[in-house]
């Protein structure tokens, strides 16, 4: 306030008063102060500033001399222990300085940047002998703080009475351990804290004063380095990745010495190969006398020989004060916590548990275990922790007060929901951090989060990841190598049809909710009005699938009303060239196809070359079954359970001409094919079918070929219907099959080639085809071609306009009930399925169930020429969507046969992970519902959609390198205000921004984006400023590379200032509040859309930025002169950031309003409204070329 009064004195004065003022200003007030006052002032100044005052005046020089003569504590680094002391010292100057301080007792900050080992005659330098000489010139010296290895060893040698103050921490540590870093510790050294990093030490002797010993990358050179180890005052012992003796017996003195430290609080041993069971025996001997009783932190990591009893005894002994435990993977077992549970102990202060703990150095080091062993570290190969859901339930029963839980790489954890029991409620859990738990199920995790009453923070790293391409087809568990042969695994997970069971193929996985799907078809066998989609569920239940199917994701065979709500809203995703879907997969409810015969062996192909000209890769089984059913209904059960594997038999269709209606076939034979993997039951059926193959060959004829190679290529898709070109060769009539299985003739004037014969009852298409995919428009269920205009939905939003969380495909049942199915977006080169007639106004080729049953003339689809067929086989991702063919096989048999052609081999078989397929990203929706959740952080996760269902306290979302994260849906999260999306390759930026800006304006919001694709800035700005968003909007385009965070960090300071001014004006000055209703949007259809938009540009640290905004007041505040409250201790100004309010003195809304008073009056006269809240969107363009830029701040 002083400077403010001074500025208020500015007025007209006569010359005499001005001369008096000048005389007063020229007075030297410092020289008028007494020596005592000056010495008191010097106590608050750094030594460097005090020494600079010597040359200012004689009185100040006297005061400095007097101060140095009486000073007892000197800090050469002015309290900044991490810095180096001032440079420029030599031996003589340092000696002169210390001679001026005869009474100094404690010398802090003796951190020279460089010291010579010895003096050089005739040359001024700063050397170790010179420093020792200067220290010895201080007779009262008690202690010195330093970080120099050779200097501290010299002090111990030549000045043993001097204490080493503070924390000794050498600053030249590295790995591999530099040979020049050496330190010999004498017995009884006067030091309390010793931190050694990358040092060669002969031994750790008896040091009674030592309280904290920290050793990292220390090489212990003596054969018995702990022979004399005894530190009775020790409170902290940390030994990480040290190169010590390999003989486990040589660590016995170490553990016994630690037991004698009765005040030991922190015990951390990483890669220490002590003898297994040693700690157990030492605890048994010492616990009565207080050994390990006061531990509050226990860390065991990569200790090769450590046993469960060692850890258990430590935990039990320290139960009263234990705060934190970090457990290495080999000890992360159910048995540890079961035993602790039986001990019936209480842990009143316990808060933090880290399971599967792996040291940071081992995680970040690129060295293999052999390289580490070469440098002297212990030979340890860690396997993942084997704790299961049963063990996790026991964790909370043991540690009921746990607040922070971290789990690393525990692949046998599946259902977090099962961690909760009557005795395990996780009532106090505040923070959960999951890393690489690849089998954890997403839906179960969401349910677990919902039941945690105190949870505030979630951190997910490498969770719910997508498997490599093809892993889903060969039964591999994503990225872990845990899996079984594809010949033994049922493919419930065909291509993108991943569910929660597929990755969990380990025999030792604990899950008590197994069931077989055989019980789901009882009500459907005799329902003739069953829809095709429902029939598939019933048919799938008759096939032997995986031996473990989870209850929580059970496929419901009856009407859609029986499905849980979270399954009804399963979300499709965009067509993409990469597969997403991790090991712990969310249940996606789909029409599950039945088994097909997928023959890929060369021998069988040669033998069946002439018999199978039209041989679709995925689905000829249905034809053979139905033809056999027509010829002999008694064979239906034999053909219903047929195998599929590496080289199963491919069944061929009968060519007998049927004159009457086909007999109704069982429902289990009317579904889509399943995939490419087999069960043991199906293998047995294959063997039986092989014995009868000669009989069946007699009753089967050749399938007619398609008219061209391109047709045959397209035919290798689903195989559920004949190809369009085949159908078009007999345009007389076609038969449509009702849901009961009978066929009806259609009028002969309807061209079969123009019909879509695949559509299940009323199912709508999953997503519109990409507009760029004009080269082929293929119906996914029958491969009939449709024109592009019929593919594009007229009544639906595009993917950019509408998140996948709001789209669900609905199949109308016969009784009006609804069943939810999630159909994938089709790969490029295919097309989306037939659209629901409500959505396409009749332009699609699908019909409702009632239409199909009651009408003899199904809706038709237009056809394009054959050259528009895709030039590659359509994938299983397409073929699994195929339904029952509606053309009778008798009509297929009447078509003209073409010349036999050997089918083109592709790698699309069950044992290949290099298939020539384009797979969609697996839809994985993380639904968060929590009363206390504050923030979620996701890194390298395979989640595609994030839904904030009910998070009233949520404040931030951070997503980094989430490759398939696309959408955000906010249902109820009113105060979330910070969004950070960095290097998320497939993020739908328009949809995310729209969701955030549509939230009610209860908070200012800031959005950080680092896109990995080009951004159309003009379109983006138009959408944001013209949209119905009741915020002032600021878009900042940052082009620094490598990334500069200066602007990003500073935005938060001044965006709130703008909002605070607006709120003051609206609440207390009765300023007009702006709105963005539909009427406002119609009123301002063109630029600037009712906003006052302006642009600011500049350069920060050599990188340009551009800001387009309608923030009021900002331009005036930026250009205003600094006021009396200006703070110049702040590092930023207008040249280094967009706006620096502290440099201007604009510290509050009231001060700012004084500055912009005129502009406020003008706005009031213009009756221009303002919004109460603001949104800042910061877009960093360093990654837009698709290559992520390394960034320490990310």
Curated annotation (Swiss-Prot):
One cellular component (GO) term of this entry: nucleus
For region Disordered, the annotated ranges are 487-529, 577-776, 793-879, 896-915
Regarding tissue, the record states: Expressed at high levels in embryo (developing brain, spinal cord, branchial arms and limbs). Widely expressed at low levels in adult tissues, with highest expression in testis. Expressed in postmeiotic spermatids.
Q: What pathway annotation does it carry?
A: Protein modification; protein ubiquitination
Chain location of the short sequence motif Nuclear export signal 2 per the record: 307-316
Q: Where is it chiefly localized?
A: cytoplasm
The compartments listed are: Cytoplasm, Cytosol; Nucleus
Q: What induces it?
A: Up-regulated by IL2. Down-regulated in tumor-infiltrating T-cells.
Transmembrane residues, as ranges? none
- SUPFAM superfamilies assigned: F-box domain, RNI-like
Q: What is this protein called?
A: F-box only protein 38
UniProt organism field: Mus musculus (Mouse)
């Amino acid at each position: 306030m002083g400077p403010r009064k001074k500025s208020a004195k500015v007025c007209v004065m006569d010359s005499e008063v001005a001369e008096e003022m000048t005389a007063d200003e020229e007075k030297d007030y410092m020289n008028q102060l007494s020596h005592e006052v000056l010495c008191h002032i010097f106590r608050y100044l750094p030594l460097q500033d005090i020494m600079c005052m010597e040359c200012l005046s004689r009185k100040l020089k006297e005061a400095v001399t007097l101060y140095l003569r009486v000073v007892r504590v000197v800090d050469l680094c002015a309290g900044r222990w991490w810095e180096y002391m001032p440079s420029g010292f030599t031996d003589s100057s340092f000696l002169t300085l210390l001679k001026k301080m005869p009474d100094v007792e404690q010398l802090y900050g003796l951190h020279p940047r460089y010291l010579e080992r010895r003096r050089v005659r005739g040359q001024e330098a700063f050397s170790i002998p010179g420093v020792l000489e200067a220290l010895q010139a201080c007779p009262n010296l008690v202690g010195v703080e330093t970080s120099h290895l050779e200097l501290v060893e010299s002090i111990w040698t030549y000045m043993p009475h001097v204490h080493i103050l503070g924390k000794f921490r050498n600053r030249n540590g590295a790995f591999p351990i530099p040979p020049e870093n050496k330190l010999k510790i004498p017995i009884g050294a006067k030091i309390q804290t010793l931190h050694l990093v990358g040092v060669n030490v002969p031994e750790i002797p008896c040091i009674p004063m030592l309280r904290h010993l920290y050793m990292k990358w220390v090489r212990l050179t003596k054969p018995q380095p702990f022979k004399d180890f005894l530190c009775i005052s020790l409170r902290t012992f940390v030994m990480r990745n040290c190169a010590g003796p390999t003989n486990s017996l040589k660590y016995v003195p170490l553990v016994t010495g630690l037991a004698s430290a009765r005040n030991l609080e922190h015990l951390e041993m990483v890669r220490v190969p002590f003898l297994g069971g040693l700690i157990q025996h030492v605890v048994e001997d010492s616990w009565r006398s207080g050994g390990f009783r006061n531990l509050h932190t226990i860390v065991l990591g990569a200790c090769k020989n450590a046993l469960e009893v060692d850890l258990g005894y430590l935990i039990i002994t320290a139960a009263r004060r234990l705060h934190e435990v970090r457990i290495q993977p080999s000890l992360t077992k159910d048995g540890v916590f079961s035993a602790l549970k039986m001990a019936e102990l209480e842990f009143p202060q316990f808060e933090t548990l880290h399971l599967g703990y792996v040291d940071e150095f081992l995680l970040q080091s690129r060295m293999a275990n052999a390289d580490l062993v070469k440098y002297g570290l212990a030979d340890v190969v860690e396997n993942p922790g084997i704790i299961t859901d049963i063990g996790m339930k026991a964790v909370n029963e043991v540690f009921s007060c746990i607040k922070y839980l971290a789990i690393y790489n525990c692949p046998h954890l599946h259902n977090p929901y099962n961690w909760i029991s009557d005795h395990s409620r996780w009532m106090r859990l505040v923070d959960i951090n999951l890393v690489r738990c690849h089998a954890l199920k997403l839906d179960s995790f969401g349910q677990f989060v919902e039941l945690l009453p105190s949870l505030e923070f979630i951190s997910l790293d490498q969770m719910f990841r997508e498997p490599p391409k093809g892993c889903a087809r060969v039964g591999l568990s994503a990225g872990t190598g845990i899996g079984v042969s594809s010949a033994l695994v049922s493919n419930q997970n065909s291509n993108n049809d991943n569910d929660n069971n597929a990755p969990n193929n380990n025999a030792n996985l604990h899950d008590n909710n197994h069931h077989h799907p055989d019980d789901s078809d009882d009500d459907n066998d005799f329902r003739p009005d069953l829809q095709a989609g429902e029939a598939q569920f019933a048919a799938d239940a008759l096939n032997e699938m995986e031996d473990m199917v989870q209850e929580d994701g059970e496929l419901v065979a009856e009407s859609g009303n029986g499905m849980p709500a979270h399954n009804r809203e399963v979300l499709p995703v965009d067509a993409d060239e990469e597969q997403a879907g991790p090991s712990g997969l969310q249940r996606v409810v789909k029409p599950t196809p039945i088994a097909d015969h997928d023959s890929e062996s060369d021998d069988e192909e040669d033998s069946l070359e002439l018999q199978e000209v039209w041989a679709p890769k995925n689905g000829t089984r249905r034809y053979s079954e139905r033809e056999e059913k027509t010829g002999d209904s008694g064979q239906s059960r034999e053909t219903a359970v047929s195998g599929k594997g590496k080289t199963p038999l491919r069944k061929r269709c009968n060519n007998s001409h049927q004159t009457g209606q086909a007999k109704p076939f069982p429902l289990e034979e009317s579904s889509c094919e399943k995939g490419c993997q087999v069960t043991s039951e199906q293998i047995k059926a294959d063997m039986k079918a092989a014995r009868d193959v000669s009989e069946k060959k007699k009753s089967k004829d050749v399938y007619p070929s398609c008219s061209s190679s391109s047709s045959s290529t397209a035919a290798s898709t689903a195989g559920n219907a004949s190809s369009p070109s085949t159908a078009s060769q007999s345009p007389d009539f076609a038969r449509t099959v009702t849901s009961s299985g009978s066929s009806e003739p259609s009028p002969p004037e309807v061209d079969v080639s123009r019909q879509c014969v695949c559509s299940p009852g009323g199912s709508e298409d999953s997503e519109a085809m990409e507009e760029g995919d004009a080269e082929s428009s293929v119906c996914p269920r029958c491969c009939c071609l449709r024109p592009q205009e019929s593919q594009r939905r007229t009544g639906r939003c595009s993917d950019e306009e509408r998140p996948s969380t709001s789209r669900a495909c609905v199949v109308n049942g016969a009784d009006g009930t609804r069943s939810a199915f999630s159909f994938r977006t089709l790969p490029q080169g295919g097309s989306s399925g037939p659209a629901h007639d409500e959505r396409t106004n009749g332009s699609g080729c699908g019909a409702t169930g009632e239409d199909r049953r009651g009408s003899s003339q199904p809706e038709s689809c237009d056809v394009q020429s054959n050259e528009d067929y895709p030039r590659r086989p359509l994938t299983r991702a397409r073929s699994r969507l195929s339904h029952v063919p509606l053309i009778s096989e008798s009509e297929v048999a009447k078509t003209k046969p073409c010349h036999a052609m050997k089918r083109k081999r592709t790698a699309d078989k069950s044992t290949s992970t290099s298939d020539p397929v384009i797979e969609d990203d697996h839809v994985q929706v993380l639904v968060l519902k929590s009363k206390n959740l504050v923030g979620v952080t996701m890194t390298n996760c395979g989640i595609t959609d994030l839904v904030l269902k009910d998070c009233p306290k949520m404040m931030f979302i951070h997503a980094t390198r989430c490759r398939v994260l696309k959408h955000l849906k906010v249902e109820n999260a009113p105060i979330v205000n910070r969004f950070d999306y960095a290097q998320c390759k497939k993020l739908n930026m328009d949809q995310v921004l729209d969701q955030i800006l549509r939230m009610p304006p209860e908070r200012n919001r800031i959005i950080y984006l680092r896109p990995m694709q080009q951004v159309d800035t003009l379109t983006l700005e138009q959408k944001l400023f013209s949209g119905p968003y009741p915020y002032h909007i600021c878009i900042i385009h940052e082009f620094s590379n490598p990334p500069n965070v200066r602007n990003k960090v500073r935005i938060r300071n001044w965006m709130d200032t703008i909002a605070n001014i607006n709120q003051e004006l609206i609440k207390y000055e009765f300023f007009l509040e702006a709105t963005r209703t539909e009427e406002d949007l119609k009123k301002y259809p063109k630029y600037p859309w009712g906003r006052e938009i302006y642009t600011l540009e500049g350069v920060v640290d050599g990188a340009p930025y551009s800001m387009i905004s309608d923030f009021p007041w900002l331009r005036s505040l930026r250009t205003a002169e600094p006021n009396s409250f200006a703070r110049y201790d702040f590092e930023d100004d207008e040249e280094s950031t967009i706006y620096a309010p502290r440099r201007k003195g604009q510290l509050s809304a009231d001060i700012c309003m004084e500055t912009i008073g005129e502009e406020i009056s003008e706005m009031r006269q213009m009756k221009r409204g303002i919004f109460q809240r603001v949104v800042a969107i910061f877009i960093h363009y360093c990654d837009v070329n698709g290559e992520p830029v390394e960034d320490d701040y990310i």
